[in-house]
Amino acid sequence: MAKLTKRMRTIREKVEVTKDYEINEAIALLKELATAKFVESVDVAVNLGIDARKSDQNVRGATVLPNGTGRDVRVAVFTQGANAEAAKEAGAELVGMEDLAELVKKGEMNFDVVVASPDAMRVVGQLGQILGPRGLMPNPKTGTVTPNVAEAVKNAKAGQVRYRNDKNGIIHTTIGKVDFTAEQLQQNLESLIVALKKAKPSQAKGVYVKKVSISTTMGAGVAVDQNTLSTTVA
């Protein structure tokens, strides 16, 4: 049997796996246990009451977190003409069409998000086998295929997160860094859950948001008591 590290022993002692923690307590616990030598991300797992086997119950989209993600995001944009200039002015690191596609084919992908205008999809479509497995393929549902590429670039830079349920109906994404304030992390979490509720498939029955857990990069998951979150959808 593998020997537990000091860090793992501390986590086991501090975190009650069967308890739903009030949000303030959950965040304080994460911060206390974040002892890595780098600034850890704060991630969230949201268990949704959907049947992930059915395409009409899958949840996918994007939302801009009010306090960003704490990450520097590099954006590549496939577009041309006036849109190309607008994308550059909005802060895109790479802008092009066939020339940008050639870089991707060579494996030169120094970017985190790909945006495309509709007229560029004839070029981007040829890159599906490269971009798809990396989660970089532009999609209208996440706002990355759009005539307004400048806005998409600004959203990506401002802290937009994309979400998509896995085969078990769970959404995994980030809500910031462990050096964010407790208030910033709570606001980001609440904003994400509101976005997920707005994206609820009409075919989903029963309890929709079943469980919410937060964790740091190197830490254990801490279940959050949803009653301590403000996530009412108007």
Curated annotation (Swiss-Prot):
<comment type="function">
    <text>Protein L1 is also a translational repressor protein, it controls the translation of the L11 operon by binding to its mRNA.</text>
</comment>
<keyword id="KW-0810">Translation regulation</keyword>
<keyword id="KW-0687">Ribonucleoprotein</keyword>
<dbReference type="GO" id="GO:0006417">
    <property type="term" value="P:regulation of translation"/>
</dbReference>
<comment type="function">
    <text>Binds directly to 23S rRNA. The L1 stalk is quite mobile in the ribosome, and is involved in E site tRNA release.</text>
</comment>
<keyword id="KW-0699">rRNA-binding</keyword>
<protein>
    <recommendedName>
        <fullName>Large ribosomal subunit protein uL1</fullName>
    </recommendedName>
</protein>
<dbReference type="InterPro" id="IPR016095">
    <property type="entry name" value="Ribosomal_uL1_3-a/b-sand"/>
</dbReference>
<dbReference type="InterPro" id="IPR028364">
    <property type="entry name" value="Ribosomal_uL1/biogenesis"/>
</dbReference>
<comment type="subunit">
    <text>Part of the 50S ribosomal subunit.</text>
</comment>
<keyword id="KW-0678">Repressor</keyword>
<dbReference type="InterPro" id="IPR005878">
    <property type="entry name" value="Ribosom_uL1_bac-type"/>
</dbReference>
<dbReference type="GO" id="GO:0022625">
    <property type="term" value="C:cytosolic large ribosomal subunit"/>
</dbReference>
<dbReference type="GO" id="GO:0019843">
    <property type="term" value="F:rRNA binding"/>
</dbReference>
<dbReference type="InterPro" id="IPR002143">
    <property type="entry name" value="Ribosomal_uL1"/>
</dbReference>
<dbReference type="Pfam" id="PF00687">
    <property type="entry name" value="Ribosomal_L1"/>
</dbReference>
<comment type="similarity">
    <text>Belongs to the universal ribosomal protein uL1 family.</text>
</comment>
<dbReference type="GO" id="GO:0006412">
    <property type="term" value="P:translation"/>
</dbReference>
<dbReference type="InterPro" id="IPR023674">
    <property type="entry name" value="Ribosomal_uL1-like"/>
</dbReference>
<dbReference type="InterPro" id="IPR023673">
    <property type="entry name" value="Ribosomal_uL1_CS"/>
</dbReference>
<dbReference type="GO" id="GO:0003735">
    <property type="term" value="F:structural constituent of ribosome"/>
</dbReference>
<dbReference type="GO" id="GO:0000049">
    <property type="term" value="F:tRNA binding"/>
</dbReference>
<keyword id="KW-0694">RNA-binding</keyword>
<keyword id="KW-0689">Ribosomal protein</keyword>
<keyword id="KW-0820">tRNA-binding</keyword>
